[in-house]
Amino acid sequence: MKTYLSDDRPQPESQIGAALESLAHTIHERRDAGEKSYTYRLLMGDLDKLLKKLVEEAHETTLAAKGIAALDAVAAAKPDAVDEKLRSAEVDHLRYEAGDVVYHLMVLLERCGISLDEFAAEMNSRMTMKFHYVKAWCF
């Protein structure tokens, strides 16, 4: 898998780190891209449009996950009833929709002035809290 970094920053150790850093950098640069850029319009336009898009993408992600769960339920009841190619396509669809959620969330964070490092610190702080809180956060 090729990882894209838009400048000479050192390569992050993980693919997810590299992907998120590259995306955050690109989103930040789009502030100067002008009206032709979709990201620019999300950053500089009506906040409600960005929020609506984030909710829409989250909804599509939940529907994709429900599709996988439905296939898994059918497969549990009747193991030969679900084609693995169909399930694989559903997983690909979930991955695609999750990417849309992450992109729109990162645009929102950029718009609100929250850096990727600040977001990572928030996530890390949640992982170091007492077990009962982390358990509740993770359902």
Where are these regions (language model features)?
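Flexible "arm" and connector segments at domain edges
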Residues: M1-A98, V102-F139
